[in-house]
Structures are given as C-alpha cells and as structure tokens.
Swiss-Prot record:
Residues binding substrate: 386-388
Species assigned in the record: Arabidopsis thaliana (Mouse-ear cress)
Residues annotated as transmembrane: 78-98
Source lineage: Eukaryota, Viridiplantae, Streptophyta, Embryophyta, Tracheophyta
Paired cysteines (S-S): none
Annotated segments matching region Disordered: 1-29
Topology in membrane: Single-pass type II membrane protein
Enzyme class: transferase
Stated name of the protein: O-fucosyltransferase 8
Amino acid sequence: MGKQGSPRSPRPETIDKEEKFGRRSLDSLSGNDLLLGRRIYASEVSKAQGSKHDQSSGSSNKFWKKQHSWLRRNFKSIVLMISVTGFIFCMDSIMVSIFHSDSRAVVQDISRLSNMTLHKNGAVDASPVQMYSRLLNLASDSLAKNEFKPDTPNFREERSSKSSQWKPCADNNKAAVALERSRELSNGYIMVSANGGLNQQRVAICNAVAVAALLNATLVLPRFLYSNVWKDPSQFGDIYQEDHFIEYLKDEVNIVKNLPQHLKSTDNKNLSLVTDTELVKEATPVDYIEHVLPLLKKYGMVHLFGYGNRLGFDPLPFDVQRLRCKCNFHALKFAPKIQEAGSLLVKRIRRFKTSRSRLEEALLGESMVKSTVKGEEEPLKYLALHLRFEEDMVAYSLCDFGGGEAERKELQAYREDHFPLLLKRLKKSKPVSPEELRKTGKCPLTPEEATLVLAGLGFKRKTYIYLAGSQIYGGSSRMLPLTRLYPNIATKETLLTPQELAPFKNFSSQLAALDFIACIASDVFAMTDSGSQLSSLVSGFRNYYGNGQAPTLRPNKKRLAAILSDSETIKWKIFEDRVRKMVEEGQKLRTRPYGRSIYRQPRCPECMCKF
C-alpha cells in the first residue's frame, strides 16, 4: 500500500450502493447479457424503454414473458447457488475469526513467556527491567546499520605488538636447581584443606606448593572442603591428574598422596591445626617462618585448614614465585573426562574445527580435537562472556538495579538469611547510598550493561557468544537485552547433550572447569567483574599462552558508570568512542606491578621470558 495521501491510495468516495452496482452492470454488460443471472430494477426497465422507443409494446410484452419463463426454469439453481455462496462466506468468516483469535492468543502467550521466567522456587519474574532503554534502542539501530558492513579487527588481538615478546618459561628446569630438596632434609608434612570453588581451590593448591618449598616440607595432596555454597564433594583426583601433578613438580617439591600412618592420630592433627583466621590474608614468608615452621618441626606435620588466598605475592623469593607459575600453568592438568568434554565443547563451538592454538594444547593435551577439515574455511571465532550477576553477589553489593521496591525487599531478605554479619557491620558504619556505590564502581555489571559495552565496541549482531556463569539474578527477563541484540548465545548446557553432561551433574566445580576451558580457548574473553577469581585465572592463562593474540576485555566499572550517567542525552557515536577508550586503556601492555597477582599478570621475569 502507498502512503496516506499518495496517488496510489486515493480516498474512496461515498456512493449509493444500489446505484454503484447498477451502473457497473450496465456499463460492463451488453445485449442479452443484461438479463442473465440478476434481478432487473424498475429504473433500468424504464431507462431501457425510453432509450428503445422504436420498439413496439408487443415486443416488450414478449420480452417479459421470456424473462419470467427463464426465471421459473432456473429458480431452484439460483436459490441453490445463493445458498452455497452464503454458506461458503459464513464458513470463511468463522475460520478467519477463529484464526485471528488464536493468533492473538499465541502472541499474548509469547509476550507473557518473554516477559516472565520461573525461579527455582516457582516464583514468577516481573516484567523485564531496563535501566537504559534509550541506549538499547540506539544500540539496536547501530547493529542493524552495521550488519552487512565489512568486519573489522574489533579487539580480536591485543593492542600492543610487544605482548608477543613475552614467552612462557616457568617450566625451565635449569631454574629448579635452587629448589631441589632431598627427602632426608624435609621438615615434615603439610596438609592442606582448601575451601571455595574450583578457582579458589586452584589458587590454594599453588600457594601450598610454594609454602612447602619455602618451608622445605613434603606436601600431602591437597583436600577440598565441602561447601554449602558449591555443594560439590569432588576431590583433587576428580578434577586434576594426580600423577602428572606429582611427577611434574618432583624435582622441586616432595608430594605424596597420603599422610604417613604414624602421623594420622587425631591429637596430632588437632595440635598442628592452623586455620585461616591464624594467617593474615596474603601473608608474607616471615609469617610462615615464625608461626607455621615451629609447629611443623614440633609435630612433624601441620594442617592448613580452610586454606585459600593466604600467601602474598611480594616479597617472595624468585624461585618460589616461579614455582607458583609452574604449578598453575603446567602442573595442574584437568582429569581426562574433563579434558574430553572440554575438547568436545570447543569443537562444537568452532563447528567441528580447531584453531590448534597453544592455549588449547595446554588445556586439552591429547584430548584436543585433531580431526582435519576439508576446505579453507577457518574455525568459527567466538567471544566468551563471564557474567557475574548471581543473587548472592547482587545482594552483597547493596546496589540498586532498577527493580524498584520489590527488588529491594527481595535482596534485603536474602541478606538477612545469608549475610547476617554484613548487616551487623552495616549498623555500625555510615550508610552509603546505592547511587554513590554505582558512581564509585562498586556495583556488578548487569547483563544490560554488558550488552551495551559489546555494542559500543562494535561487535556485530551475528557475533557468537559463549556465556559462562551461574544462575543470573532475575532469570531470562534480565537476560532479554543481551539475547535480543545478540541471539547467537550458547552455554555448555546447549552445546552438550544431557548424556554428555551427566557425569558432571551435581559437581559444580567440574562444570565450572568446562566454563574455564571454553573461556580460555575463546578468541576474545570479556568479563564483567575484574575481581572474580575465574576472570583472574582465565586472563592470566591467556596472557601466558596467548602470544599476544588472546585479548581480554575488562571494563572499568567506575568509568562506565560515568558514561552511563549520561544515558538520556549522550549520542551513540560519543558513547562508542568513550567505551572504546575505556577498554583500550585496560588492554595496555603492563608487566606485573609489585604486589599484584602472578596468576592474573604472569608477564614478569619469574614466570615468562622476554625476547
């Protein structure tokens, strides 16, 4: 149809219905056709008689007799035809009415389903919460305009060419000479019970290796404490390769699978117990020498219970620091079943092709997909996004996420159930407003904010995204901004069959290992919380093995909050420029600053060699 007022769509004139049909019949029919299949109006007869004044009245009577005779002969057929036509018309009207009714119902059902999701407890989500509707509309328009434009490099490699000058070398055995220990000189055994999830436990393992070397002790293969949060009974051998771990570090640290029988008495364990409250966070070597070594020598063992991030990064002897890197990047290999599932996961993301990068080789070993693929088509490139927007994190932040009074009540109830110490501490301190928390970068990014960052960086709608993370607070309604702008989203649950996931069911740490693999192997890794342990370890692996071609996108939450504070007025082009500058600043090549995590930033002489 044309636009209103155009020549193609003239406004119809009102005409008399009878006059219209009469004129059309007279103009279009001629001769005896006037008599067929329709009733003759008196006005037409009068006109016909006037126009044919040369005909006699006898002829007129004859004409009427023929007409009446024809009507009598065909009366039943005419009635039948009218009845059938009427019946068809009625049925058509009924079917159209039913179709439209069903269509409206389906549309309404889809709308309700898109605006609601079920929590595990059966409660229904409210309508989708959008804090930046205007920017989302601008982002959608921008994605539509750029969809068919040529692809750009688009943050698919690190900004500095000097990043490729750093090469992995923590496994250099020549440096291990200084840490060689004989079994006769061991000061005793160190037992470790690590807390937390997969990533916290990984850090605890490598810290324990460093402490064992520092105190000249024999390390008993670490145990993992059962957590009411993670609810995973997995132990070391369920997640990592025990024999490889022991063999790889044998020249620097003595590691055994079990404590000797003569040291297993309950009294001995209790007397030598050191809890995490007795060691300060990021303790120094002096702390261990003064508080742990005496117990080790006295009882022949020490039990570090609830162990985690209890060893600082500086000051620390060069070789002990290097040993941490060797543990994290070389000695800890995932168990074969995790490697195989991780290999299958990456294989399906890349559409049965493999990039065969050193990253994938380090992660997957012999399980890496080695199948050759005909043709010159490259493996599918993908972005891995780690969303940290779980209910516990959201509640603990004390921030406002646009859900109004219902959201505030829900999060307060969660805090009362899970964080009583937080509430107790808040009563004794000066309150900080949610607005101030957001302004200072203390609030976790929502899926909506993550979507705007990706769009601002120029990632196209067709971008393939692997989504890592736990249950998102708000469910699918919170995810709508992301899923609407970037529909090509996959998770381990959508890429692997229920049968393939079955061995990992109820083992959250093993499932997290699959996310760990998919994130490290990705072409681009984007995080929403730089403080997360998974993001820290993943970015460290990518720095160590990536050869400058494994970029990590790390938004500065404080700067992003300042950008989004202008959401109602800012132009999209300006928004893009500011977001790009923010991310580029975080991608600048840096060697590890003093005191910073060697797991996140391994570019330093202790872990890597510069050529």
